Structure formats: C-alpha cells, structure tokens
C-alpha cells in the first residue's frame, strides 16, 4: 500500500545523500553563539547550520526553537548535537565556547582555563571538517586565535579571530552619529588587540575620501578642542557599559561575525579588521595574532593590507604584541 507521501510525490532523481555546499557550525550556544546563529540565518548564508555545546537540554531547545522558524528562513537544515560528527563537512566553524572570566581572575588564568576547553574542541572540529575555516570569537580573542592555530594545525589563512571587526564597527557608528551620516559612509579603522589596547588609526579616518585629520589636524590628540579622542575611548568602554547594563554583549558581535562569513562564503574579497598572525610585520618578532586590515574570500584570509601607520601607532601595536606574548609564552600544553 502506497503511503501518502508516495501518492503525493513522484521522484525524478534517485534519492542520495547530498553533501552541503555552505554548511556553518557554531560551537557554543550561549548568548553570543545564538546571536551568531540568528545573524547567519537572517542573511541566508548557510544551507545547513549545526550547533554544538556540552549542555544537551539547552542545545536541543535552541535547535528546536530555530527549526520552528523554518518557514521564515531559507536554511533547509538545522541540526545540533554534543557529538562533533554533526559538524562534518562544515565550510566555516565559529567558536564562541569558553569559560567566563571570574571576578578578580587574571587574564592568564582565564586564558589557561580556555586553553583546556579548546584542547577538546579544536581537534574535534578539524577531525570532521579538515578543510574548514575557523573563526574564533571567544575572549581574549587574539590569544585564543593563536591557541586555535596551534591546536588545529591549520594554515594561518584558515584561522581567523573576529578581532577588531566589531571595534571598528562601533568606531564608525559613533563617528557617524556625531556627523549625522550612515556608518557605511564613515571610514575608519581600529587595529591591534581587541579591547583595551586597540589602536585608532586617525590618519585614515575619512568621509567620501576627505581626510578628517586634514580638516582638524589635532583630531585624535589631547589638544583637540572637539575631543574626538573620546570616540575611541567610548569604543573601548562600550562592551563594559553594555555588560553592566544587560549582563553580556551579543547582537553586535553576532552581526559582525555574519558579516565576516558573508565575505568568505560569497567570495567577496572585502577587507575587514580581523585577527591574524602578524609576526614579521611592523617589527613584531613573536607569533602573536592582532587585527590588521585583511582580505577575506572563499579561501579564507588571503592577504593583509600594508596600512601606513604613524610611529606612535606602530609603537602601540608593538606594545600590544608584547603584552600578548607575555601571556602566550607561559601557556601550557600547546
């Protein structure tokens, strides 16, 4: 007796298992992981989305909640499991998992605890998706990108830290607000370490090709009567502010990660400030990851733009590199 489905649907092609073309995995279904997931779904970037976490109930609940929105999405397959086999054949894997910083905990201690988490996660990712590109989002992102590169054995063009992509977006938003224009028409770059010691490249800030520093030579300095330096200060403090108000940040980082993925899956060769291996650049001698303007396309992070930086900006970059190396050199089991 034919089933309803057999009566309804007459097959033309033989049934066979299809390998996904644009599969994306998100590791960690906390606030940031789910913001990445919904941003990826909203931009219809994946034909399959896989979620992984150690918390099975939370994981299944998030998967079901997203699946129930399938009518409103163009991602035909949403799966989840604590077993990494569910991630097989991913083009891109986003890592948001990790332990949170406890009150009064040193960064080195936090990093070492996250290294221990990553020692389990990263080999599993590479086992099931040996050709993937890994985007690291967990903090401190620059150090954990280095850790991921070391643990994965992947070439450096396939291990990328979300880095200053969000810092630069915040910078452009805040400047654009001051000027009354859209952030996409306000160009400016935050480079270096994601967070407190990031570098605002004031010399490159422009609107429609007009250098703002030429209009106001004091821009970004302490002598500036308009106090533009405050904008960079607000960028650095903005995450702390949001965390103080709502307990965490997630929407903007989720959107910024989807932006990076779009450049790669659509082979756009757009330029983003993301964390990459900077040894040999700007006189940096150690294997550290910092944000520089990088070209992202289907192969991953294929090139770095040689940004003309002023001496004090280079000095700041080197200082960041030294700070990071001080922590990295003491990490165990890499």
Swiss-Prot record:
Topology in the lipid bilayer: Peripheral membrane protein
Disulfide bonding pattern of the chain: none
Classification via InterPro entries: L-lactate/malate_DH, L-lactate_DH, L-lactate_DH_AS, Lactate/malate_DH_C, Lactate/malate_DH_N, Lactate_DH/Glyco_Ohase_4_C, NAD(P)-bd_dom_sf
EC number, as in UniProt: 1.1.1.27
Assigned GO CC terms: cytoplasm; cytosol; extracellular exosome; membrane; membrane raft; mitochondrial inner membrane; mitochondrion; oxidoreductase complex
Binding positions for substrate per the UniProt entry: 107, 139, 170, 249
UniProt keyword annotations, A-Z: Acetylation, Cytoplasm, Disease variant, Membrane, Mitochondrion, Mitochondrion inner membrane, NAD, Oxidoreductase, Phosphoprotein
Localization of this protein: Cytoplasm; Mitochondrion inner membrane
Binding site for NAD(+): 31-53, 100, 139
Tissue: Predominantly expressed in aerobic tissues such as cardiac muscle.
SUPFAM superfamilies named in the record: LDH C-terminal domain-like, NAD(P)-binding Rossmann-fold domains
Catalytic residues in the record: 194 (proton acceptor)
Pfam family, one: Ldh_1_C
Residues the record lists as Phosphoserine modifications: 44
Disease with which this protein is associated in UniProt: Lactate dehydrogenase B deficiency: A condition with no deleterious effects on health. LDHBD is of interest to laboratory medicine mainly because it can cause misdiagnosis in those disorders in which elevation of serum LDH is expected.
Family statement: Belongs to the LDH/MDH superfamily. LDH family.
UniProt protein name: L-lactate dehydrogenase B chain
Taxonomic path: Eukaryota, Metazoa, Chordata, Craniata, Vertebrata
Gene that produces this protein: LDHB
């Amino acid at each position: 007796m034919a089933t309803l489905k057999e009566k309804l649907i007459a097959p033309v092609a033989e049934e066979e298992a299809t390998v996904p073309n644009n599969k994306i995995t998100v590791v960690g279904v906390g606030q940031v992981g789910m913001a990445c997931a919904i941003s990826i779904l909203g931009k219809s970037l994946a034909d399959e989305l896989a979620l992984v976490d150690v918390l099975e109930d939370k994981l299944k609940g998030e998967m079901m909640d997203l699946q129930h929105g399938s009518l409103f999405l163009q991602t035909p397959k949403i799966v989840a499991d604590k077993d990494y086999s569910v991630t097989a054949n991913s083009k891109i894997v986003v890592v948001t998992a990790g332990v949170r910083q406890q009150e009064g905990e040193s960064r080195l201690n936090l990093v070492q605890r996250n290294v221990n988490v990553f020692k389990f996660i990263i080999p599993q990712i590479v086992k099931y998706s040996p050709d993937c590109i890994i985007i690291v989002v967990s903090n401190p992102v620059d150090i954990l990108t280095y850790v991921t590169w070391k643990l994965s054995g992947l070439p450096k063009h396939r291990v990328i830290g979300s880095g200053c992509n969000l810092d630069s977006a915040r910078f452009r938003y805040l400047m654009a607000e001051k000027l009354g224009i859209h952030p996409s028409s306000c160009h400016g770059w935050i480079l270096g370490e994601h967070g407190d010691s990031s570098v605002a490249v004031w010399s490159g800030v422009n609107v429609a090709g007009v250098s703002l520093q030429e209009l106001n030579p004091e821009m970004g300095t302490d002598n500036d009567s308009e106090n533009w330096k405050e904008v960079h200060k607000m960028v650095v403090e903005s995450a702390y502010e949001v965390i103080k108000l709502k307990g965490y940040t997630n929407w903007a980082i989720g959107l910024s990660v989807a932006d990076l993925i779009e450049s790669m899956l659509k082979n756009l060769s757009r330029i983003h400030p993301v964390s990459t291996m900077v040894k040999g650049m700007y006189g940096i001698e150690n294997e550290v990851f910092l944000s520089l303007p990088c070209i992202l396309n289907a192969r991953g992070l294929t090139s770095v733009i040689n940004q003309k930086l002023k001496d004090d900006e280079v000095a700041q970059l080197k200082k960041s590199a030294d700070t990071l190396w001080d922590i990295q050199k003491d990490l165990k089991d890499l």
